[in-house]
Amino acid sequence: MAASSSEISEMKGVEESPEVPGEGPGHSEAETGPPQVLAGVPDQPEALQPGPDTTAALVDSGPKAELAPETTETPAGASETAQATDLSLSPGGESKANCSPEDLCQETVSKPEVSKETTADQGSRLESAAPPEPAPEPAPQPDPQPDSQPTPKPALQPELPTQEDPTPEILSESVGEKQENGAVVPLQAGDGEEGPAPEPHSPPSKKSPPANGAPPRVLQQLVEEDRMGRAHSGHPGSPRGSLSRHPSSQLAGPGVEGGEGTQKPRDYIILAILSCFCPMWPVNIVAFAYAVMSRNSLQQGDVDGAQRLGRVAKLLSIVALVGGVLIIIASCVINLGVYK
């Protein structure tokens, strides 16, 4: 048994010897035979297993007690050498073998991290996609708004007439003020609502206004006076028309604008000049002045004034002539009678 144990130790040494010098000259074998290195890595548990088996076999069969500890020591050394060779040949393999559970743990840790990152990304995407979702939420909100809008509308509609009611009053007040400023009598407070406001000015007449702006009523009165003057012209107490210069288109002569078949008013200026030779000096001078005024009014188009002034000039000139003739006769009689 001792020989067998020694042989086993030698065989293990021989097996370890080509593996240990793999670092030096026998490195080519390790390089050329990667399957041996790969086979050596899984053989580690096999090298560890025969240790206790051999210890049990040697303890049971071997009568010598010294060999048992030797055999027990040799597998431990063999295992150490095998581990050293494994470390020398494949440092990456040990790291892989030793770190394989750590790598798995790291991978498992990284996987939940990746899953957390993916979940965080998905959550951020969902959050980014989530803001549009509240947009439809205010969509039902406009529904109560139109419902709420019609409610104030009926309240506003009756208020509109109340606001529009003061406008007629304001207009009536403004119209009243304008009428007061325009020298028109304003209406009372309730007249503006009951009926239309009276026109402040009468509608314009179709007839053309006179040259000097005389109203039609005055013209009618002047025409009547002229007719009365013509009827009573021979009587000393006949009413005489006014000496104002008011136009009249009815009495215009053929040579005057507006005259149609009527006689041109005479100014009697020749008669007034003859009366100036009579000894009625103030009267004949006044008659001459009226005759000149009559001609001027006729040139201005005031036919009625020219006719009226001519009539006065005629009367004064006749008085001056008659008076002058009488004075001359009286003076002659007196002078001739005295001398006789």
From Swiss-Prot:
Intramembrane segments: 269-289
Topology feature Extracellular, residues: 339-340
Record-linked InterPro entries: CD225/Dispanin, CD225/Dispanin_fam
Bias-annotated ranges (Pro residues): 131-155, 197-207
Membrane topology: Single-pass membrane protein
Keywords, comma-separated and alphabetical: Cell membrane, Cell projection, Cytoplasmic vesicle, Membrane, Methylation, Phosphoprotein, Postsynaptic cell membrane, Synapse, Transmembrane, Transmembrane helix
Location of the protein in the cell: Cell membrane; Presynaptic cell membrane; Synapse; Cell projection, Axon
UniProt region (Disordered), positions on chain: 1-261
Modified sites of kind Phosphoserine: S28, S238, S248, S249
A single GO molecular function term of this UniProt record: syntaxin-1 binding
Transmembrane segment boundaries: 318-338
Residues recorded with modification Omega-N-methylarginine: R240
Phosphothreonine modifications at: T74
A GO CC term assigned to this protein in UniProt: synaptic vesicle
Subunit organization: Component of the outer core of AMPAR complex. AMPAR complex consists of an inner core made of 4 pore-forming GluA/GRIA proteins (GRIA1, GRIA2, GRIA3 and GRIA4) and 4 major auxiliary subunits arranged in a twofold symmetry. One of the two pairs of distinct binding sites is occupied either by CNIH2, CNIH3 or CACNG2, CACNG3. The other harbors CACNG2, CACNG3, CACNG4, CACNG8 or GSG1L. This inner core of AMPAR complex is complemented by outer core constituents binding directly to the GluA/GRIA proteins at sites distinct from the interaction sites of the inner core constituents.
Biological role stated in the UniProt entry: As a component of the outer core of AMPAR complex, may be involved in synaptic transmission in the central nervous system. In hippocampal neurons, in presynaptic terminals, plays an important role in the final steps of neurotransmitter release, possibly by regulating Ca(2+)-sensing. In the cerebellum, may inhibit SNARE complex formation and down-regulate short-term facilitation.
Family, as annotated: Belongs to the CD225/Dispanin family.
Protein name in the entry: Proline-rich transmembrane protein 2
Gene transcribed to yield this protein: PRRT2
